[in-house]
From Swiss-Prot:
One of its GO terms (cellular component) is cytoplasm. Residues 135-161 have a biased composition (Basic residues). Residues 720-1023 form the Piwi domain. GO terms for biological process: regulatory ncRNA-mediated gene silencing. This is Protein argonaute 3. Residues 411-521 form the PAZ domain. GO terms for molecular function: RNA binding; RNA endonuclease activity. The gene is AGO3. Gene3D superfamilies: 3.40.50.2300, paz domain (2.170.260.10), Ribonuclease H-like superfamily/Ribonuclease H (3.30.420.10). It comes from Oryza sativa subsp. japonica (Rice). SUPFAM superfamilies: PAZ domain, Ribonuclease H-like.
Length: 1109
């Protein structure tokens, strides 16, 4: 590639580079139009000619053109890297300094590599004044060449004496190119007098280490705590042995073996007389890894052996080989311990804890601990959730009390009988209900000798006695009933019932009669299917719902939960790390919980309105231990929202069929006015409807359009609709979809039963509705005082929260997308947020095109504040420890590349984790605690039970009303602001106080909480879209979900996005960029790209509102 001319007045540069497999080519002297390269040819394996000199000035700017570029390519993919990139061109405003680097620094550019990103320094304008003024008037080539060599020497001198801020990140340099931005590959410097000096290759971001010192001065007291972490004792001088075991079929088609088959073969192997003594000294992970406490005899293990399993006609080929010894002394020498040693210990502890238990993920449930739920097909398994960790105090096992709803083990036919579906023929509604109940269920079959599990895809359209198929051997059409009779000697006793579809592929159907299918022990029951309805049989006492019964079993107050955990750990028979395996490996568990010292952070100062004049604020600090406050007026103050929104036109569509008390809406309106909102007293539209209209998309759309039309006839714009409902309904999803994406109307839904609450509870309910309404119409309920925002309050700061909502567990279809949501604050009080939602690939955790999303959010911030933020605190939710690298080196890198303009903002990255099982308990009754025995809000732990090297802490920011409080586990992955431990913990805690819907701190920092709500709103949009197309065939639906492919990647796919989380939430900007499929995903996808439907764009009127509240 020939040398490029300078690209724009600010970041022009001369010198060119060759792309991999490109090469210098014969450079041209053409004008570098808008930064395009000069003419010339590209050699197929590096150019044969050096790049020419771009002597023409770039059109449109006082920038001199390319200079010497390209270079003589000598190897494939290396052409064009000899000269160029280190050269500088002078821009009209600002010259960008580019560090030099060598070709040898980037071995990945050998053949067909991708351009490598170079390091960057922050630009320093004052150093460029002389260069700028001295070069801008020289346009002839020989003057430009002399200037370049002169300033290159000056640059080298300055660079040698320049000191770097150690907190400055290294990352890719982005240079604007017209409307778009492209990356600058590295280039080799011109020969220097000091050949040994060169830049290091770019390094990846790593999670930051814990800074020296700790928190303390800002806390209001200490508290003694117990943590459900139990110390693990292991033989520190011993060595375990890691073996690789491979098992495959010796005859028949080669297929992936199930875990049950692998475990059976492994057990059979150690029944061999020479290995029998070691059968209790082996831990197996169910795949390829085997761990032993002693080395296996060499004369007993051969590289490959064949044998048959008892009661099976199949032959298996097994190979076992030593991978490496694992000295446990390494756990003392390295913190955290080496990954392979920790993985081995984890497998050993799991194996030592699983005897006689049903193991599901990290859950261990003794079969003796099940509790049947009356009048249902569900049982509750009581057990533990366990995870092995390395902490500052050493190796520990985190053990938590757990209850798992499971199907009652037995025949699927018994399940059908309890549903009273044994009559023939099944009605359409019965067939649909049975299909929904069984779809996704894992079953075993009784007509064949196998323990393999099959997933139910659905039911057949016809009963068993009407199903026929073509025999692949004879080519004749055979009845299913006759096939089972002849092949398996089985009579089908219920031919009127449909069969279960257990097919693993569309090409090979597998229909099995219901009576030959069984539900195994420990088959998880989907929580989403739990019944909320209570028994309403006349003459019988009202029975609690299944969900209510399970909640009573699973939710324990702190003291009861602590006792349950201690009982489970101390159980000699069913406790963790028990039995022969634990004895042979000499691993044991301390029966006492670990004791730590926590600190209680002081609550922040909040700002409210005074109700006297706009802009005047009232500051107050919460003094109650539970950190709750209210809006009740006192003689000496008047508490109103910090900024009241304006609601000029609102209406009511009553889906409760007039069941709502007539004065309830009026009470809401008066409460809104009392809290400082500007709201008209009378609605501009009222209509009484019913739940049938809400459930029918066509009728619902007509009702909503009529409401909007009625407002327009009065020359008003409908802003909000109150929508009372009799009960929760799926029509809620289509209501939100239509109003927020088609019509641009905010909605406030609530149950009509709220009007029947007692006066005190009703007033609280109405207040919460008013707070939600104010947030939706652009108001601000409460704000943080600047003194409560450490370090960044004096700057233009932005808080960003991001989360991804995935399809629920057990979902069979891979066409269902994951929903990503990103929110960002736009005010100094950290209370107003804007949102962007995107749909992306199924179960893809990395947020696609995060940089483009953040660019939009910064644009919204700039629109409000007339300037861009110079400090960003990025909160990320829902990622595991193993995905920290993805957050830092993919999401963060994408963000930096897109938002970097001049001096990019400083960034701090914080991950919030709620899906863990660490619990904090007051040591005794003398410790400060809530009324129900939970730790107080603001309790933070950052010693002993935290990561030995990472910068993390546990923060319990909320008052646990029910059960045991779960602290949030925060990790600081990157900190360019230099927060002290106290400052960072205080910032996170204080952000929990500005959640718009309540007057108490929430369990999660507000930016993350909002992202969670917004992502969940996107999930509702998607489900609402699917409800609007019930008649679409599978083929047409699949075709509709296929986005257009990107021209540069066969597997690239279009994507819009959407939110993720837990309550009503929503977002905007879903029409933006379309992400490109990850390479690995594209290669493995049989469908081509990504199978998901784009979400509709958010209506422009709601684009920057907090509609998700």
């Amino acid at each position: 590639m020939a040398g490029r001319g300078g690209r724009d007045p600010r970041r022009g540069y001369d010198g060119g580079y060759g792309y991999p497999r490109g090469g210098g080519g014969q450079g041209g002297t053409n004008r570098g139009r808008d930064g395009q390269r000069g003419g010339g040819r590209n050699g197929p394996r590096g150019g044969r000619f050096p790049g020419g000199r771009g002597v023409e000035p770039r059109r449109g700017g006082d920038v001199l053109g390319g200079g010497q570029g390209g270079g003589r390519g000598t190897t494939a993919g290396a052409g064009g890297l000899v000269r160029g990139g280190s050269e500088l061109a002078v821009g009209a405003e600002l010259r960008r300094r580019v560090p030099t680097c060598h070709v040898n620094d980037f071995p990945e550019l050998g053949i067909g590599g991708t351009p490598v990103l170079v390091r960057r320094w922050r630009p320093r304008d004052h150093r460029d004044q002389h260069d700028h003024q001295s070069q801008r008037h020289h346009h002839r080539h020989h003057h430009h060449q002399r200037q370049r060599h002169h300033h290159h020497h000056q640059r080298q001198q300055r660079r040698g004496s320049r000191t770097r801020d150690p907190r400055v990140r290294r990352g890719p340099l982005r240079i604007p190119y017209g409307e778009d931005e492209k990356e600058e590959p590295p280039a080799t410097p011109i020969a220097s007098s000091n050949k040994n000096k060169r830049e290091e290759p770019p390094t990846k971001h790593r999670p930051m280490a814990r800074p020296p010192g700790g928190g303390g001065p800002l806390s209001k007291g200490e508290v003694k705590l117990l943590v459900n972490h139990f110390s693990v004792d292991y033989p520190k001088e011993s060595t375990f042995f890691h073996y690789e075991i491979r098992i495959k079929l010796g005859d028949g088609p080669n297929r992936k073996l199930s875990k049950a088959e692998l475990l059976t073969v492994k057990n059979e192997l150690f029944e061999h007389e020479s290995l029998q003594e070691l059968s209790s000294a082996v831990a197996y992970d169910g795949e390829r890894n085997l761990y032993t406490c002693a080395e296996l005899p060499e004369d007993c293990i051969v590289p490959v052996s064949k044998f048959r399993v008892k009661d099976s006609s199949r032959t298996y080929i097994v190979s076992v080989k030593l991978k490496k010894p694992l000295p446990l002394s390494q756990l003392l020498e390295q913190r955290p311990g080496p990954r392979d040693v920790m993985q081995g210990l984890d497998v050993i502890v799991r194996e030592a804890s699983s005897f006689g238990k049903i193991v599901l993920g990290q859950g261990f449930y003794p079969q003796s601990g099940s509790e049947a739920i009356s009048d249902s097909n569900i049982v509750a398994l009581k057990g533990t959730q366990q995870s092995l960790k390395c902490t500052q105090k050493g190796l520990i096992l985190c053990v938590d009390y757990s209850v798992l709803p499971c199907w009652k083990a037995g025949s699927v036919l018994d399940l059908v009988k309890t549903m009273k579906f044994m009559e023939y023929p099944l009605l359409e509604d019965q067939l649909k209900k049975l299909n929904n109940a069984l779809k996704g269920l894992c079953v075993t079959v009784s007509h064949r000798k196998t323990e393999e599990k099959y997933t139910v895809k659905g039911l057949t359209d016809k009963p068993a006695d009407q199903i026929t198929f073509k025999d692949s051997k004879s080519g004749q059409t055979t009845k299913l009933i006759e096939y089972y009779k002849e092949t398996y000697k089985k009579e089908i006793e219920h031919p009127m019932l449909p069969c279960l579809d257990l097919s693993k592929s569309k090409s090979k159907q597998n229909y099995v009669p219901i009576e030959f299918c069984n539900i195994p022990e420990g088959e998880r029951y989907p929580v989403a299917r739990l019944d909320d309805k209570k028994s309403d049989n006349k003459g019988e006492q009202e029975k609690p719902s299944t969900k209510t019964t399970l909640r009573k079993i699973s939710i324990k107050v702190a003291s009861s939960r602590k006792e349950e955990i201690l009982d489970l750990v101390g159980n000699a028979q069913d406790g963790p790390c028990r039995g022969k395996i634990a004895q042979r490996f000499r691993i044991s568990l301390d029966a006492a919980m670990m004791e730590v010292t926590g600190r209680i952070l002081a609550p922040p100062t909040l700002e409210l309105g005074t109700g006297t004049s706009r802009g005047q604020t009232f500051k107050f600090t919460i003094h109650q231990d539970d950190c709750q406050w209210n809006w009740k007026l006192k003689k000496y103050d008047k508490r109103v929202v910090a900024h009241g929104g304006t609601l000029n036109c609102w209406g009511v569509v009553d889906f409760s069929e007039g069941d709502l008390e007539s004065k309830f809406i009026d009470k809401v309106v008066r409460k809104c006015s009392a809290l400082g909102m500007v709201m008209t007293r009378k609605p501009c539209y009222e209509h009484v409807s019913n739940m049938e209209v809400l459930s029918d998309p066509k009728s619902l759309r007509d009702a909503l359009i009529e409401a909007k039309r009625a407002a327009e006839e009065e020359d008003k714009k409908l802003q909000l609709l109150f929508c009372p409902m009799l009960n929760r309904c799926h029509g809620y999803k289509t209501l939100k979809l239509m109003c927020e994406t088609e019509l641009g109307i905010q909605t406030q839904c609530f149950l009509s039963t709220a009007a029947k609450l007692d006066e005190k509870r009703q007033d609280q309910y109405i207040t919460n509705l008013a707070l939600k309404i104010n947030g939706k119409i652009g108001g601000s309920n409460m704000q943080l005082d600047p003194d409560s925002i450490p370090v960044v309050s004096a700057k233009d700061f932005m808080f960003i929260g991001a989360d991804v909502n995935h399809p629920p567990p057990g979902n069979v279809s891979k066409d269902i997308p994951s929903i990503a949501a990103v929110v960002a604050s736009v005010d100094k009080g950290a209370s107003k947020y804007v949102t962007r939602i995107r749909a992306q690939y199924h179960r893809c955790e990395m947020i696609q095109n995060l940089g483009d999303i953040c660019k939009e959010l910064i644009g919204a911030y700039e629109k409000v504040n007339k300037k861009k933020p110079d400090s960003i605190i990025y909160f990320r939710d829902g990622v595991s420890d193993g995905q920290f690298d993805m957050v830092l080196n993919e999401e963060l890198a994408d963000m930096e590349n897109k938002i970097m303009v001049g001096d990019y903002p400083k960034i701090t990255v914080i991950v919030a984790k709620k899906r863990h099982h660490t619990r904090l308990f007051p040591k005794d009754r003398n410790q400060r605690q809530t009324k129900n025995g939970n730790v107080l809000p603001g309790t933070v732990v950052d010693t002993d039970v935290v990561d030995p090297t990472a910068y993390d802490f546990y923060l319990c920011s909320h008052k646990g009303e029910v059960g045991t409080s779960r602290p949030t586990h925060y990790y600081s992955l990157l900190d360019e602001h230099g927060f002290a431990s106290d400052d960072l913990q205080k910032l996170v805690y204080n952000l929990c106080f500005v959640f718009a819907r309540c007057t108490k701190p929430v369990s999660l920092a507000t930016p993350v909480y909002y992202a969670d709500l917004a992502a969940y709103r996107g999930r509702l949009y998607y489900e609402g879209m699917m409800m609007l197309q019930p008649a679409a065939s599978a083929a047409s639906a699949s075709e509709a979900m296929m986005p257009a492919a990107q021209p540069q990647a066969a597997a690239a796919a279009a994507a819009a996005a959407s939110p993720s989380s837990s309550a009503a939430s929503s977002s905007e900007g879903m029409t933006a960029s379309q992400p490109q499929a990850p390479a690995a995903e594209a290669a493995s996808s049989s469908a081509g790209a990504a199978d998901f439907r784009e979400l509709p764009p958010m209506h422009g009127d709601l684009l920057n509102n907090m509609f998700f509240l």
